[in-house]
């Protein structure tokens, strides 16, 4: 019986080629006509993102991508008009323009001149020339958009958020990292809480507001009232929010992940508000909140015991706080306590005794632990990731 690979049905070849990386898919297509035909089957390229340098005209580029069924594109460098891409990819689903610093409102405006119903994800991160004008175009012609990345687009203002709230009703994920001009008014637009005609993006599930320095507790009030389906909220480096703002968030039943890293005004009181509410968080990050101490760990054990991931790096916690927390946190998978310089071997022994499900722990910069405590941690049955970083001990204590 003939068993040579050339006897395989094209469908089987396509299944095999589907497991190859992008470069090897292309190489397989060059072997023979049978492999070429199989390699061009759309199932082989399902989910693949084409990464393109648009430098010169290539008439065969987009027909080739469409023949493979590729609908996700990342532009690595943009020296041609963006409209060249839009016209060539009629059914495009995802367009990543992150880091295309030369993209302007004018260039985007010429590309988006009619509705593009297929586009679901648009990444404009670090496209620093983009302003509210572009958001007006996006809101008008990309009404099916579900993911919008605007991190580092520092010229966007509250007016831009009003346009988003008006036109992008299907939006599920929005990244506004380091959009420095945004204030509580803009968040109110998104949440449908202002007197504007915009309904708001009430279907949002993920919202990143990292390093939006003008936001205050009023933004959290808007979010808690209008964005009730939110699952992930990133407020890291938002220095204007305080414990009082967390009281607003404490009854958001859909919220699963909350990032408060480097929010300088958050203290044990804020953690108490979160723990006393009706949250069902699986992930909490309060790293570098230096007003968070051992009392917060007691609150977490009392009201946030469903956490799978907890980050407390550089917080003012000690072995006593660890002792108050670990007995109730049996489901914890990831614990980050790097640069918590008051933690000693005693704390590690408590962790090893009670947190048997841990798969990862960060001990970077925990300078008071020794070989003894480390040996206890390495005996955790599920441990896969151990970050020591600045962990220090004498030569005689080093693990061999």
UniProtKB/Swiss-Prot annotation:
One of its GO terms (molecular function) is ubiquitin-protein transferase activity. LRR repeats lie at residues 144-163, 170-191, 203-225, 229-250, 254-275. It is found in: Cytoplasm. GO terms for cellular component: cytoplasm; SCF ubiquitin ligase complex. It comes from the Eukaryota. SMART domains: LRR_CC. GO terms for biological process: SCF-dependent proteasomal ubiquitin-dependent protein catabolic process; ubiquitin-dependent protein catabolic process. InterPro entries: F-box-like_dom_sf (IPR036047), F-box_dom (IPR001810), FBXL14_F-box (IPR047932), Leu-rich_rpt (IPR001611), Leu-rich_rpt_Cys-con_subtyp (IPR006553), LRR_dom_sf (IPR032675). Keywords: Cytoplasm, Leucine-rich repeat, Repeat, Ubl conjugation pathway. Residues 2-48 are annotated as: Required for down-regulation of SNAI1. Residues 2-48 form the F-box domain. Part of a SCF (SKP1-cullin-F-box) ubiquitin-protein ligase complex. Interacts with SKP1 and CUL1. Interacts with SNAI1; the interaction requires the phosphorylation of the two serine residues in the substrate destruction motif D-S-G-X(2,3,4)-S. Substrate-recognition component of some SCF (SKP1-CUL1-F-box protein)-type E3 ubiquitin-protein ligase complexes. The SCF(FBXL14) complex acts by mediating ubiquitination and subsequent degradation of SNAI1. PANTHER family: PARTNER OF PAIRED, ISOFORM B-RELATED. This is F-box/LRR-repeat protein 14. It comes from Bos taurus. The lineage of its organism: Eukaryota, Metazoa, Chordata, Craniata, Vertebrata. The gene is FBXL14.
